[in-house]
């Protein structure tokens, strides 16, 4: 990277293997980054900050290990490492403008990091530091970028998403304990069904979150295997045989996460199956969150003409024309986030099969979609917990009114009077808009006290077979 000043105050002239190029005077990047900026004016969206920070960690680890192996002067390595750690800390995020739709290997972003770090290190040493020969020593974009994706995705999941899910689970469980004795009408096919408690309903949501946490933790084990050291195609050409394993140890120390050197680096470059798997876990979580959000929307619907079982916290006016209207805005946001994450997974799935021969060539797309999914999910899960679950109120009068008039309670009489007789009672109760207990007293030979016991909604939430003269069994 050779630099000379142009006559313009706004630009300097940088040189790379393809010739001279004008670069903004204050930019820390060099010619290869500038070429990428000019080649890919596509979306206006640059690579995620977490990915850039991971590149910083990798360059810092590489400089340290190359110095220990005697491949890089210690003084130079020290300045490269310091500059790289500044990148990892997010101090130079604005210096990474390359579009996500770029070369499929992510080479432009890797060179962006190499050039910025070289410039910063040169400022400290006052001597020449080359982005390829020194900062990128022993590396290739083909092993650096897949490694950066795995590091940044792991940090995003462990640092934000998993803690958010744990918080949501705790809030759901807390509300379930507080509402444990409140019985409500269950629904299947959106139609009235047998009763259950709010604790049982919320418990199902909590179980979904527990399963999501377990799936994510299991997938992360495979993301911890880093292909750094495989260089161009997995053979490790132009790098010390000890570089990859030693650099991964340094990365573990820098991030606080136990990473391992991948046993098969060919797989780590050519196949991104573990990243597709992680995206699949995001997809599954999105489905779970959409189910929970839609349940909340249905339960909150009304307040007069819908189910109206719960009242969600009022966060903002819901209509520009209908005064007093308040909408379930957070559950709606959850649904939209879930929809976007499901779309991201489709993109990652298609991108994952683009590993022709020795290299996947859609790595920036995988990185962007994975990290955005993790960010969206982590943020919206916290909102769901703190702005919905914590503050929702149960409208017990409404819940009790509907419960008492639910003809499906007659299901408990099936073992005693038979399905057909029970159906007669249910249909009559529906038709006459009367409590099922009243109709059952008229249509059966059972006494009112026994019927009241058999049709007690709270007892029915415990399951079992309810018989005359006894409890559930």
UniProtKB/Swiss-Prot annotation:
- Can you state which reaction this protein catalyses? (S)-malate = fumarate + H2O
State any further remark.
Answer: There are 2 substrate-binding sites: the catalytic A site, and the non-catalytic B site that may play a role in the transfer of substrate or product between the active site and the solvent. Alternatively, the B site may bind allosteric effectors.
Q: What is the annotated localization of this protein? A: Cytoplasm
Q: Report the protein's function.
A: Involved in the TCA cycle. Catalyzes the stereospecific interconversion of fumarate to L-malate.
The subunit field of the Swiss-Prot or TrEMBL record says: Homotetramer.
Q: Which residues form the active site?
A: 189, 319
By its UniProt entry, which SUPFAM superfamilies does this protein fall under?
Answer: L-aspartase-like
Keywords for the protein's UniProt record, in alphabetical order? Cytoplasm, Lyase, Tricarboxylic acid cycle
Q: Name one Pfam family in it.
A: FumaraseC_C
Q: Which gene encodes it?
A: fumC
Superkingdom is Bacteria
Could you give a single Gene Ontology term from the biological process aspect? tricarboxylic acid cycle
Site feature location: Important for catalytic activity: 332
Q: Which GO terms describe its cellular component?
A: cytoplasm
Per UniProt, substrate binds at 105-107, 130-133, 140-142, 188, 320, 325-327
Which Gene Ontology molecular function entries are recorded, alphabetically?
fumarate hydratase activity
Q: Which cysteine-cysteine pairs are annotated as disulfide bonds in the entry? A: none
Organismal lineage = Bacteria, Pseudomonadati, Pseudomonadota, Gammaproteobacteria, Lysobacterales
The catalytic activity of this protein is classed by the Enzyme Commission as 4.2.1.2
- What pathway does the UniProt record associate with this protein? Carbohydrate metabolism; tricarboxylic acid cycle; (S)-malate from fumarate: step 1/1
Q: Which family does it belong to?
A: Belongs to the class-II fumarase/aspartase family. Fumarase subfamily.
Q: What is this protein called?
A: Fumarate hydratase class II
């Amino acid at each position: 990277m050779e630099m000379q000043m142009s006559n313009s105050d706004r630009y300097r002239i940088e040189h790379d293997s393809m010739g001279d190029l004008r670069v903004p005077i204050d930019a820390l990047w060099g010619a290869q980054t500038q070429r990428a900026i000019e080649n890919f004016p596509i979306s206006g969206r640059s690579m995620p900050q977490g990915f850039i920070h991971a590149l910083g960690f990798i360059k810092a680890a590489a400089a340290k290990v190359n110095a220990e192996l005697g491949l890089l002067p210690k003084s130079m390595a020290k300045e490269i490492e310091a500059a790289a750690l500044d990148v990892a800390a997010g101090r130079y995020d604005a210096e990474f403008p390359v579009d996500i739709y770029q070369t499929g290997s992510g080479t432009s972003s890797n060179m962006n990091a190499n050039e910025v770090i070289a410039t910063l290190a040169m400022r400290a040493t006052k001597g020449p530091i080359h982005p390829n020969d020194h900062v990128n020593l022993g590396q290739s974009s083909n092993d650096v970028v897949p490694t950066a994706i795995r590091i940044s995705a792991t940090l995003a999941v462990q640092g934000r998403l998993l803690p958010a899910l744990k918080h949501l689970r705790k809030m759901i469980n807390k509300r379930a304990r507080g509402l444990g004795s409140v019985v409500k009408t269950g629904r299947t096919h959106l139609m009235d069904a047998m009763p259950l408690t709010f604790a049982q309903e919320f418990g199902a949501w909590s179980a979904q979150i527990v399963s999501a946490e377990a799936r994510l933790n299991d997938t992360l084990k495979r993301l911890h295997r880093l292909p750094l050291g495989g260089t161009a195609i997995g053979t490790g050409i132009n790098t010390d045989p000890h570089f990859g394993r030693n650099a991964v140890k340094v990365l573990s120390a820098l991030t606080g996460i136990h990473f391992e050197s991948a046993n098969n680096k060919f797989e780590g470059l050519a196949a991104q199956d573990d990243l597709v798997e992680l995206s699949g876990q995001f997809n599954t979580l999105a489905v779970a969150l959409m189910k929970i959000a839609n349940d909340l929307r249905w339960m909150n619907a009304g307040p007069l003409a819908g189910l109206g079982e719960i009242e969600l916290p009022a966060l903002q006016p819901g209509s520009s024309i209908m005064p007093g209207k308040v909408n379930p805005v957070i559950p709606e946001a959850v649904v939209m986030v879930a929809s976007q994450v499901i779309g991201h997974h489709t993109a990652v799935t298609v991108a994952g099969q683009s590993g022709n021969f020795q290299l996947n060539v859609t790595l920036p797309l995988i990185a962007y979609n994975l990290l955005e999914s993790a960010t969206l999910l982590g943020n919206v899960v916290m909102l769901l917990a703190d702005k919905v679950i914590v503050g929702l109120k149960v409208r017990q009068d409404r819940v009790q009114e509907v419960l008492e008039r639910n003809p499906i309670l007659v299901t408990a009489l099936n073992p005693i009077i038979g399905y057909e007789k029970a159906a007669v009672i249910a249909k009559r109760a529906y038709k006459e808009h009367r409590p099922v207990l009243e109709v059952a007293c008229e249509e059966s030979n059972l006494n009112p006290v026994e019927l009241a016991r058999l049709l007690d909604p709270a007892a029915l939430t415990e399951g079992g077979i309810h018989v005359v003269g006894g409890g559930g069994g």
